[in-house]
Structure formats: C-alpha cells, structure tokens
C-alpha cells in the first residue's frame, strides 16, 4: 500500500533499538521506550520540491510528536516537518 503525505508531512519508519543490553539482559517490548529516530519513507510534494528532506534520510524527532499509523502490518509515524529536529548524516 502506498501512502502520500500531504502538506508539510513525512512518513517515517522508526529505527528499532537493540533488545539486549551490553551485559546480556533482554529488554521486553513493554519496558522499552519507542525510539526517537527513523527513516523517511515518503515525503509530501511540497517538501520534495523544497529539497529539505528526501526518502531514506535518517531523522530525529520529538518524543510526543506525530500520528502513528499501520500500513501493511508495519508501524509508521506521520510527522509535520516542524516536528523533525534534524537529519543524521553519514
């Protein structure tokens, strides 16, 4: 299923964190905080035209921002451009 964000929005897939600590303790899903980083999967036409973000950019966003949605049994978050704090560059 394709999703096309409108306005100044982007579709982001969260980057999963390790489920095991350095000492070998496995962290259960209900004890983990959701990561505040993700990979951009789709951008609105306005953002694409302005060349601010592009697909596959790794971004950092605020803790209580965006709307969570499910597409093809995968979880994503739809964020306003202003909710994105920055891009992680390689």
Curated annotation (Swiss-Prot):
Source species, domain of life: Bacteria
Query: NCBIfam families from the xrefs?
Result: PRK00364.3-3
Q: Name one GO cellular component term.
A: cytoplasm
SMART domains documented for this protein = Cpn10
What GO molecular-function term can you cite, just one? protein-folding chaperone binding
Q: What is this protein called?
A: Co-chaperonin GroES
Question: What do we know about how this protein assembles, alone or with others?
Answer: Heptamer of 7 subunits arranged in a ring. Interacts with the chaperonin GroEL.
GO biological process, any: chaperone cofactor-dependent protein refolding
**Keywords from the named record:** Chaperone, Cytoplasm
- Tell where it localizes: Cytoplasm
* UniProt similarity note: Belongs to the GroES chaperonin family.
What is known about what this protein does?
Together with the chaperonin GroEL, plays an essential role in assisting protein folding. The GroEL-GroES system forms a nano-cage that allows encapsulation of the non-native substrate proteins and provides a physical environment optimized to promote and accelerate protein folding. GroES binds to the apical surface of the GroEL ring, thereby capping the opening of the GroEL channel.
Give the residue spans that cross the bilayer: none
């Amino acid at each position: 299923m394709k999703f096309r964000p409108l306005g100044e929005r982007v579709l982001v897939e969260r980057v999963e964190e390790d489920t095991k600590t350095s000492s070998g303790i496995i962290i259960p899903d209900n004890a983990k905080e959701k990561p505040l980083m993700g990979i951009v999967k789709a951008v609105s036409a306005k953002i694409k035209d302005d060349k601010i973000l592009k697909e596959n950019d790794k971004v950092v966003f605020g803790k209580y921002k965006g709307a969570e949605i499910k597409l093809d049994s995968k979880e994503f978050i739809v964020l306003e451009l202003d909710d994105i704090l920055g891009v992680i560059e390689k």
